[in-house]
Every structure is written in C-alpha cells, then in structure tokens.
C-alpha cells in the first residue's frame, strides 16, 4: 500500500480508491494539492488539511504565514535580482496557489518581472530537478535559491558540491521549512521556523468537534519567523 500522497502522485482517482478501501471516521491530509483537497471537501467524511493548497476550499485546516515580501526585499537589498523559488508543481498548475502568487507579488513590488525563470515547472522528480538546475545555471545562474522541502534542499546541496558551488559565497540558499538537520550544517541553512503547538491544538479541537457531530471547517494559520542562518549573503562579485 502507498505510504504517502507523493507515492500516489497526488492522483485524485488513486486517492479516492484508497479512501474507499480504508473506511475511516475522519481524515487528516498532509500538504495535499488543491485538487486533492477539493475532492476531500466534497466527501461526507470529515477531513482536515494540515498545510496544503487549500485557499477558498471549504475544509478545516491549518497553515503557515511566511512573509515572503520581507525575504525578497532583504535579498534585493543585498543585490539579488535572479531569485528562484523551487516549489511543487501543484502550486503552479492549474493555477498559481496563494503561496506562489505571494512570491510573484513580492518580486513585482521590488521591480522584478516574474516569469518561468523565477517559478520553474520541474515535475517534482529527482531527474527533473537536475534538469532544471542545469538549465538555470547554463546561462544566467541564480544568485538566490529558495526551496520548500528538505529533500529538495539536499539535492541542491549535492548538485552544488559536485560543481564547487558554495553557499553563500556563490548563491544564497533558503529553505521555507525548518528541520533539525540544519543544526548539523555549517553554516546553518537559512529557513523559516514556527511554533507547532497552536496548530496541534487546533487539530485536537477539530477531532473533538467531529466526534460531537459538528461541521467544523474553520482554518487557522500561525506566523513563521525567519532564521537568517549562514547561507544567505550579498550577491557574489563578478569574476
């Protein structure tokens, strides 16, 4: 049996079959695509979206508020213009998610016209990421790379190491999620961090409401704090 939504390729039909084969009183869905959350919101079984692209979908859930405007502004103040966000494809298709739209708006505010270079579609596969990085570094290498997951970050660090690219000397590197792994890195990876207690309390309250037969679809979010770390710095000088 598949162990995650990623193993199911966020395929609504496959997920629907899995749900039908495993009856439950309620579902908690982690970091799902918009299409998946739309499907769950239309089912009679209560569902909770723990993160994921759920803007305007009538489903209970929680999320994180990361101030990408401040992050992008700080990068631009250090001379960065070639800023790239590597994000899952479901944030880009069939339409931009709230998160991807916020990144575009942050670029526009500082005078950068966003395009496919800044938000590339790469298929969320290891080989797709390598092809994407090859393309980015072929002509106009990015001066700042923003990632969304530790697996993507590790792949980028491996790619950099094989080519003698270092952060922050050659490119600033930021991950949007925290990880205990970062404490083992020297320099520590720049990232966002947040308190999960309020998010977990909300899940417990939702579960209690579901047990009482209440139709609870409230969404909450918590504010993340930017941890600068040591992988972000000024644009490298031209060689």
Language model segments and positions:
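Short beta-strand elements in bilobed, periplasmic/extracellular small-molecule ligand-binding domains
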Residues: 1-10, 85, 100-127
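Alpha-helical recognition/docking segments in bacterial nutrient-uptake
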Residues: 1-73, 77, 137-138, 151
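Periplasmic-binding protein-like
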Residues: 19-31, 82-87, 118-119, 139-152, ...
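Alpha-helix capping/helix-boundary segments
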Residues: 33-34, 91-92, 99, 151-153
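Glycosyltransferases and closely related glycan-assembly transferases
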Residues: 38-45, 105-107, 156-165
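Hydrophobic alpha-helical segments within soluble ligand-binding/sensing domains
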Residues: 55-86, 126-134, 153, 193-213
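An alpha-beta-alpha
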Residues: 71-112, 218-233
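Flexible loop/turn connectors
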Residues: 133-239
């Amino acid at each position: 049996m598949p162990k995650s939504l990623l193993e199911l390729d966020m395929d609504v039909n496959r997920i629907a079959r899995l749900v039908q084969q495993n009856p439950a009183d309620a579902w908690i869905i982690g970091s799902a695509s918009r299409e998946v959350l739309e499907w769950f919101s239309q089912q009679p079984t209560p569902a909770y979206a723990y993160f994921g692209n759920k803007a305007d979908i009538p489903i209970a859930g929680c999320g994180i508020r990361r101030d990408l405007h401040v992050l992008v502004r700080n990068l631009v103040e250090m001379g960065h213009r070639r800023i790239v966000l590597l994000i899952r494809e479901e944030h880009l298709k069939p339409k931009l998610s709230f998160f991807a739209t916020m990144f575009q708006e942050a670029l526009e505010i500082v005078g950068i016209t966003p395009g496919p270079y800044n938000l590339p579609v790469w298929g969320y596969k290891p080989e797709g990421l390598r092809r994407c990085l090859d393309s980015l570094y072929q002509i106009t290498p990015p001066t700042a790379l923003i990632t969304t997951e530790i697996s993507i970050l590790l792949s980028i660090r491996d790619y950099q190491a094989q080519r003698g690219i270092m952060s922050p000397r050659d490119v600033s590197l930021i991950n949007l999620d925290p990880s205990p792994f970062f404490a083992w890195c020297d320099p520590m990876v720049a990232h966002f961090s947040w308190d999960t207690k309020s998010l977990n309390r909300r899940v417990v309250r939702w579960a209690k409401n579901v047990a009482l037969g209440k139709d609870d679809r409230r969404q909450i979010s918590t504010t993340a704090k930017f941890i600068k770390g040591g992988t972000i710095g000024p644009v490298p000088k031209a060689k």
